[in-house]
Every structure is written in structure tokens, then in C-alpha cells.
Amino acid sequence: MAHKKAGGSSRNGRDSQGQRRGVKRFGGQLVLAGNILIRQLGTKVHPGENVGMGRDYTLFAKVDGTVRYEKFTRKRKVLTRVHIDAV
């Protein structure tokens, strides 16, 4: 009788869920107060006018309005800031 031994099992085969970070509202979009603008790790983007920051660095709109991104310089480093222009 022919026999086939069991194949080896791989030790990989697992992966963690993505954390759904990134920009949720882009420049020029209308947002409502409380809408999440960006989910991020650390301050890749800084909060500007009418934008709040949560404990986990999430940026959110404080008022209804239009999203506007702006680049600015601090200590010879170009950073990004997000504002909400109230409607």
C-alpha cells in the first residue's frame, strides 16, 4: 500500500488587522463639527483653527465648515497644519 507522510506546517500564517489610519477628509471638503479629519500616530499633521486633537492624536472638526491644509515651517522643518474655515 502506498503511504504519504504528513506535510510540514508553516509557522507563518497570521497577520494583525489594519488600524485604519490616514486622512478621512481632504482639502475643500465640507465637514460637520465632530467629524474626524485624520487618524494618525503622533503629530504628522498639526491642528490649526477650529480643529481639536484627541488623546490618540486624532484630529477632528470643532465647527461646521471647509477643510484647508497648509504647510508651515518650524525650526527649518516643513510641517502640515489643518484648519476648518467656518461656514
From Swiss-Prot:
GO molecular function: structural constituent of ribosome
Protein name: Large ribosomal subunit protein bL27
UniProt key word Electron transport: no
Entry GO terms, CC: cytosolic large ribosomal subunit
Keyword list, A-Z: Ribonucleoprotein, Ribosomal protein
One GO BP annotation of this record: translation
Region (Disordered) location: 1-22
PANTHER family, sorted: LARGE RIBOSOMAL SUBUNIT PROTEIN BL27M (PTHR15893:SF0), RIBOSOMAL PROTEIN L27 (PTHR15893)
Species this chain originates from: Nitratidesulfovibrio vulgaris (strain ATCC 29579 / DSM 644 / CCUG 34227 / NCIMB 8303 / VKM B-1760 / Hildenborough) (Desulfovibrio vulgaris)
Gene3D superfamilies in the cross-refs: 2.40.50.100
InterPro entries, per database record: Ribosomal_bL27 (IPR001684)
